[in-house]
A protein has these predicted regions:
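N-terminal Sec/ER secretory leader and immediately downstream segment
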Residues: 19-168
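Extended amphipathic alpha-helical interaction segments
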Residues: 127, 132-284
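C-terminal motif of bacterial Sec signal peptides marking the signal peptidase cleavage site
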Residues: 12-14
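Sequence contexts marking disulfide-bonded cysteines in secreted/extracellular proteins
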Residues: 16, 79, 115, 242-244, ...
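Sec-dependent signal peptide recognition
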Residues: 1-7
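Alpha-helical oligomerization segments
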Residues: 276-336
Length: 336
């Protein structure tokens, strides 16, 4: 029974590293350096989960189109009546923002077709022209509701776990979705040919289950924190590090070994992966920040990436300074 108890205790104590191999790399790196320096590891500030403002602070309600004057024969012929009637049905009223965005592009195309291809009375043309202009004005609002308030995107933008190296195949899809949304925002008012011919719903499932942007953001914060405390650990104890001729360089050689075997072989490749993933999502990050700012809110991932770069560079500079002081040229010298 005692053996079973201690085995279970060991298993539980190792769960964090076992379930989170990315964090485990940084824990190992920090602990090994502390061991070599013969000092306790520094206390780490736990990183908060990535959240976004409440949906109510970001959602914008827009008026529904009523059938009103649209019940004429011509408007039935051009497809407008049936399209709006379907939207006003029980199912249409509960469409999520992705489906609603598809409806808005279909509506703009249908309105344009009615105005350009069907004989209309003066009243009908006046009404449809007003609706057409109104729907173009509303398009950025519908896009904001997709980007900032849909359940899909709120899941995509939030996270409390590290970016896994196994998520490489998700990046292209998420990046493509942000590019498509960005292109929609940049569509000139009234230029029907610039509206997408595809359905936005096709992007929904992958965006919802990946949480890629949120994980990148959480990982930028987490790696910045680990690099910061590790750099401080080294800086505060650099007087302990002895090197030079006729000196006992055992400790320095151990540190160099930790640098080579853990930083160069494990930490640095992961940092490069995180940075590369962020770069591929940069257009999406900029778009989110811009649209949040218009609502008086902020997301913060761009600043998190800047901090990540700063902390990485500070850590690299410590090692470069130490190796220079000790007259050592490292084959794979650290790079930011």
């Amino acid at each position: 029974v005692k053996i079973l108890f201690f085995a279970l205790l060991a298993l539980l104590s190792g769960c964090n590293g076992w379930t989170n191999p990315e964090r485990a790399i940084f824990e190992k790196y920090h602990q090994r350096l502390a061991n070599v320096l013969d000092v306790p590891p520094r206390e780490l500030n736990e990183v908060s989960a990535i959240t976004i403002p409440d949906k109510r602070a970001l959602y914008q309600e827009l008026p529904r189109l009523s059938l009103g004057l649209l019940e004429s024969y011509q408007l039935r012929q051009c497809g407008l009546f049936n399209l709006i009637a379907e939207k006003n049905s029980q199912l249409g009223k509960v469409q999520d923002p992705f489906h609603d965005l598809d409806y808005q592009t279909t509506l703009l195309n249908t309105l344009n077709g009615c105005l350009t291809e069907y004989p209309l009375s003066e009243d009908e043309r006046t009404t449809l022209t007003r609706l057409y202009e109104q729907k173009w004005q509303h398009l950025p609002v519908h896009l904001d509701n997709v980007l900032l308030t849909s359940e899909t995107m709120r899941k995509q933008l939030t996270a409390s776990s590290w970016l896994s190296a196994k998520s490489r195949n998700q990046t292209a899809h998420v990046s493509k979705t942000f590019h498509a949304l960005n292109a929609m925002y940049e569509t000139p008012k009234g230029v029907i040919s610039r509206l997408p011919s595809f359905s936005f719903v096709q992007y929904q499932e992958e965006m919802e289950k990946s949480r890629l942007m949120g994980k990148v953001y959480f990982t930028l914060n987490s790696t910045s924190e680990w690099l910061d405390v590790t750099t401080k650990l080294l800086e505060e104890n650099q007087e302990r590090i002895v090197c030079g001729k006729n000196r006992d360089t055992t400790q320095f050689r151990y540190l160099k070994n930790v640098f080579q075997s853990i930083y160069v072989e494990e930490v640095q490749p992961y940092l490069a992966f995180v940075d590369s993933t962020y770069q591929q999502l940069n257009d999406g990050a900029v778009l989110i920040e811009q649209r949040m700012e218009l609502h008086g809110e902020s997301y913060g991932v761009i600043k998190a990436h800047e901090q990540f770069r700063t902390k990485t560079l500070e850590h690299v500079k410590f090692w470069q300074g130490l190796f220079k002081r000790c007259g050592v040229v490292v084959g794979n010298s650290p790079t930011p």
